[in-house]
């Protein structure tokens, strides 16, 4: 059956078809079509309803409107009172179409009973068609049942039964539809729980429906398309009561159900009972009731079945007799007449239908022709309309042209009138101007008098302007100072918070993790307090504290709010580095770059940078350039180089250190920018060229470390200060585990390099946290680039990105531990990066001077080498001098031995000479002039040895002999040592500097300079000892033997000096003069100690050389030299001093340092006293330098030697 949109409730109560055979006179059903009229379309005719053949008697009965008697029996009447039996197809609420019964109805040709309920529910109205023995009860539109058109008055109506009709019925079974619990009794009828059904569903309600006895019956119902089937029933007539109540909306629009609409009839929650539906059950004993919802759903609360006790079958006559208050007998003959008549009417209707079909085809053909003609006329109308529009356009253009010409003419006329009026105005203005000129001349004279006042006022204004200018300068200076203080305080605040600030951000769970039901590994509530708590199995595991913590719900604006102050630091001249760290897939690139509609830290920081520059444009001048690079597989790549150029000839970039100490990558493309749009285009170009790949952990994984460098050069227009700072925006690649990501090939190499660089970064952070002396910045290109940022001269911000997935808990803990170490680093205050261009020039000049100094140092080095050669020569000379000194000491020791031998021979001679000298002195006393009172030298400095005992027992004082004529005067003093010509001249001796306790000074005669150390026979070098008493009266002189090669050793000399007994036997002479030794051929033994402080007389001493005169002892010459007297008086003092010096040399000093490497004498910075020439004359003091390198150690104790 086709879908029917007519909202009808169909109820089918049909018994099972019987198996008995039919007679030859059974009614044959034929199908006919019902034409449905519509305003827009025609419904084709179809065979829709089976029409039974009726007998002539039934045809007659059909023409009557009331039930009449036929052959003495009462038959069914026909009523034309129901207009709803006609289907109006033009309803706008219902779709149009054709309707026909189900195929089962046509095939089985069962008998059916149609009941129309359009006239109300007061009386049962049925339409009966006889045929087979199965009956059908349906509530449907008549157009669905009958195959021919019926007039509005045509319907079937059953007469009302008499009052005692229900009393003759016997209840069979009653069902409470939808009830599953207990039975319900209503008006002595017991309704059983719901049974014998198929389909539908049970519904219940708590609403009160009906009276108190019917509440339980109508509170349950069966809804939908369902059927009830009752078996094992006795053949006969049955009456069915159907109980309805719409306790639930049945999805059917109210008021449009044709047939049975409960809501429109009685409303909701109100019972509706359809009673006395008659049904004939055959011998099979089956009865079925089917309810279908045509529109919406069918609903039924209860079924009650009763049996009529008076209905019987008259099988003998072949008649069906229904006995009750009215008997109805339908004969087979009447039925045959009805069938014949129905066939005739069907044939007529077929011919009419065929004729109408032909007419319809003619009408269609005519309609097609009219359509073609209409199209042709339409085209002609369109062409005419187009031509008309063109003509109208042309007419409009012409009219506009004419209007423009008229407007131009009118304008020219108005222009001419304007010129005339303006001429009249000019004439009038000329007269007025003449009058005004006169007035202006008068005013000019007045203004001349006002000029002086204006000049005075202008001078006052200028002075005020000058004061304001000074005030402006003061304010300018204060403003600069305040601005500087603001910067310092602002940066101090950031420094107090820490040079490396650490922000933590947790991404939200993605769609896949949410679908999989992954648990949260981070406590979201803790992020509001700046703390991150890692959860494990729902319990806190470890907590971390950072400067700022952003949860999964934090926006990009919230993240940038704490990052904004770093843009101000960049403008103020400080280096700033912002980088993101974390495992792959945690949102590092999203935080740094973001999307087009949700920008990240990079874009917002640069936007804030240009906003500050805009606000300071009247006080500062800034230049900004941008470069983008990446570290891919430990290689630096410039992302701003075109792809074609980078692919053809890839350039290797290296990191260089500038003279200021900063690190730079030469050769990078630096793009100058003027606005945030240009900056973003450059950064976008670099980001597009970045190496990105797909892994199992992240679909868009960064395979390199991306670094954006923004260089800012600023100049203060007020004080001329220049700054040069850098902003580093670093997006690190995510750390990955090879076992987790399952990468291979090139991806494996990338992962290894990424992990290597991040491991190097971890080593640097560990070394900085432990304040190690060596920081391994050069282990990776990444750490080498970040050396300036992590080294302490910049302000650094780190974003640590973590995942809330509990499966990533190990990576999250690693990232948080790393961030905690970074937060604990103390780098010290950041330094302001000044642009010292002039300083660089000076440094270049210094470098040039350094090069020149290197050349001079080379020359100095050559000179030092020369000096080293000279030092070597000096050492060699010193070695020779030392050798000579050793020889001199050996000779002196030999002299001591010779003196011992010679002293025994001269004692007698000395005694004789002393006796003679005393005699001569007594004789010559009266002849000598008195000595002068003026001493030649200071008496306090000229000492005569008073420890020597007197030779004579008498205390007689002796007068000193007068000076010989050959003695020079005191004022003839000159430099005999430096002038060779004066070497042979005689002059007074210099002051000896020795203390003398003698009463009178004994002058000494000068001796001529010696040019050799060889022994001389001159009497001027002879030594006479006057303090020793004579051993004998002999005056014989002895010649000293020459010194043998194996003379007295130096050790023997020391032994003699230290031995007092040997000192008395052998007298050691003192060096003559200031440290000079006199080497004579002959020596006179010293005199014995004096026992008196009386002055010694002059004793003439003869030569000690072996001569005939000496041997005879005659003609001895007296020695009157002052030099001889002085040497005799100081012999003992010299001996004692020399003995003390020898002992000091024998005892090593505890503080004496070892000799310098290389040996030799000490030739350091020492003062050396040189004595050249006569005894007692001090030479010039010369400062000698050793010219040794400063690296050599000097002896702590300086030594002095007298040569």
UniProtKB/Swiss-Prot annotation:
Keywords: ATP-binding, Coiled coil, Microtubule, Motor protein, Nucleotide-binding. Residues 336-395, 846-901 form a coiled coil. Residues 1-28, 907-931 are annotated as: Disordered. Residues 19-28 have a biased composition (Basic and acidic residues). InterPro entries: Kinesin-like_fam (IPR027640), Kinesin_motor_CS (IPR019821), Kinesin_motor_dom (IPR001752), Kinesin_motor_dom_sf (IPR036961), Malectin_dom (IPR021720), P-loop_NTPase (IPR027417). It comes from the Eukaryota. One of its GO terms (biological process) is microtubule-based movement. ATP binds at residues 582-589. Residues 499-825 form the Kinesin motor domain. One of its GO terms (cellular component) is microtubule. One of its GO terms (molecular function) is microtubule motor activity. Belongs to the TRAFAC class myosin-kinesin ATPase superfamily. Kinesin family. KIN-14 subfamily. This is Kinesin-like protein KIN-14Q. It comes from Arabidopsis thaliana (Mouse-ear cress). The gene is KIN14Q.
